[in-house]
Amino acid sequence: LKLHHFTPMCDEVYRVPVLIVTSLVNQPYILDLVPGQSMVEFLLKKGFDVYMIEWGRPRKEHRNLSLEDHVLDRLPACVNKVLSHSGESQLSIIGYCVGGLLAVLWAAIDAAMRGKVSAGPLKNLVCMATPVNSDGLESLKTWMGPDFDEEALLAEHGNVPAEWVQNALRSLRPFGKVAGAANLLNQADQEAIVRSNLRMGKWETDNIPFPGGVFRQMVNDFLRDNCLINGRWKIGAYSADLAAIRVPLLHLLAQDDHITPYASSRDLVQRVSSSDREEVMIKGGHVGLVAGRGAQMRMWPALEAWLAQRSA
């Protein structure tokens, strides 16, 4: 586990620091690819003090890492470190995909523990392409249904191998690689676009192993039993209830997202108790949402405008 800090690139800096919670199965550099194609860089130039979690590549000895470890220990430790390092009492969290789900679980549990009278460390919550309702993940639910033996997979490997994760994601859009190659050929005369797409394509194949304990819980509690939406998801001794979340919430979604379809993500804004809540749909796909042309032209500016109003 690493916590990265990026220094703002301007003189006037917003008071509230930002912590980015990345996915468990992908490298975090999709949010900081290269100068000009970096959400982190964009936020720094706008005056935000940015921190980002890198969960690391789990080894065999990490096979028992669980949601409890991430939601009740590792993520809160990062929150506390950001606050102590920045000298502030509150922060904004931006969570991408599974990272957004981890942030939601922590936010719900932390809010429930504090009740309505105590303001916690979370000032704003931004989720990007975050699934909360597994009924909207039909392909994954079918594939990992009752006949799928996750215990055999984990007994053999400890953690879910990166290659297995990659094949699982590719199965959601079987002809995606062919379509992507055809699209690149059609844009071969536009070097900047080609280079951008190649960078994103390289990242999509750079998966990391899925911690075995977390995978077991995600398959059973999230995919099969849909515990978050049904109000039955317990992380350790704590219940994760979306209705406990009351902080300002922004959910950024991709119109053509095959990994987090709208049916799996739309309930987030509907189920929280926040009076200040907003959902923004951006044209494009799951990766393009955070690093493509649509991100640069639409998503990043929308994110910056929303955070700026709530970070004084």
Model features per residue range: what roles?
Residues I94-A103:
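Gly/Ala-rich beta-loop-alpha elbow adjacent to hydrolase catalytic centers
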Residues L1-R59:
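Short, surface-exposed "cap/lid" segments of acyl-processing enzymes
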Residues S84, E88, L102-G213:
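Alpha/beta-hydrolase-fold enzymes
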Residues I259-Y262, E279, K283-R298:
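Catalytic histidine-centered segment of alpha/beta-hydrolase-like enzymes
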Residues N226, D256-T260:
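Acidic catalytic loop of the alpha/beta-hydrolase fold
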Residues N64-H85:
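Alpha/beta-hydrolase active-site loop
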Residues I245, H251-L253, D257:
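Short beta-strand/loop motif that positions the catalytic acidic residue
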Residues V247, P261-Q270:
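Short alpha-helix in the alpha/beta-hydrolase fold that links the catalytic acid
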